[in-house]
Amino acid sequence: MKKLTSQISLFDHETGQLVAGVDEVGRGPLAGPVVAAAVILNPEKPIEGLNDSKKLSHRQRVALSQEIREKALAWATGWATVEEIDQINILQASLLAMQRAVAGLQVAPDLALIDGNKIPKLDMPAEAIVKGDSKVAAIAAASILAKVERDEELDRLDVIFPGYGLAGHKGYPTAQHLSALRELGVTDIHRRSYKPVQQLLQGD
């Protein structure tokens, strides 16, 4: 596995800045919140195996999530709800979730590194890094925390809204999910601003 560049060696070797990695999960699903995380890693407590959460198994993500929570200097998550996604669109909701994650850090970073090409409004300097979750350890850590927390929420919602298969596909528009939507209807946890859900509501 390619070793990811740590926040310390890449960004703050000379200045000693505290750098937070920030990422979000859940832009594509038809159901559930978008979840973001922010992580400031501790250079004295390295974490082996950090990588883009999509490249890790469920078991690896869960184990790393626990290790990140135990070893990071600071971490926090932030959500944007289905209602917020429908009101302000998924891009703005993703940025809002990232804002909330950074605001939740118990230690204020000097710099935030954001996965992707959009930067939320923050109280500190920030830099966007395309595919940052595959390049920067702190962003990879954030992607893992966000993914694990969102998956746990979809597992919980699967119990409340049985029949949609949420625990399996995590809200993504799989054939099973679309079939269940047609048979069982749209729920309060479905994103009405998304086209497949809109079409069902319109009777198409």
From Swiss-Prot:
The entry's cellular-component GO terms read: cytoplasm; ribonuclease H2 complex
Name the family: Belongs to the RNase HII family.
- Spell out the reaction equation it catalyses: Endonucleolytic cleavage to 5'-phosphomonoester
Q: Which residues form the RNase H type-2 domain?
A: 17-204
Cofactor(s) needed, names only, are:
Mn(2+); Mg(2+)
Binding residues for a divalent metal cation: 23-24, 115
Q: What is this protein called?
A: Ribonuclease HII
Instruction: Please name the GO terms that the record assigns under molecular function.
Output: manganese ion binding; RNA binding; RNA-DNA hybrid ribonuclease activity
Return the cofactor note field.
Answer: Manganese or magnesium. Binds 1 divalent metal ion per monomer in the absence of substrate. May bind a second metal ion after substrate binding.
Q: What is its main location?
A: cytoplasm
Give me the gene this protein comes from: rnhB
Enumerate the subcellular locations listed in this protein's record, separating them with semicolons.
Cytoplasm
| UniProt EC number | 3.1.26.4
The record's listing under CDD domains reads: RNase_HII_bacteria_HII_like
Q: Which UniProt keywords apply?
A: Cytoplasm, Endonuclease, Hydrolase, Manganese, Metal-binding, Nuclease
Gene Ontology biological-process entries = DNA replication, removal of RNA primer; mismatch repair
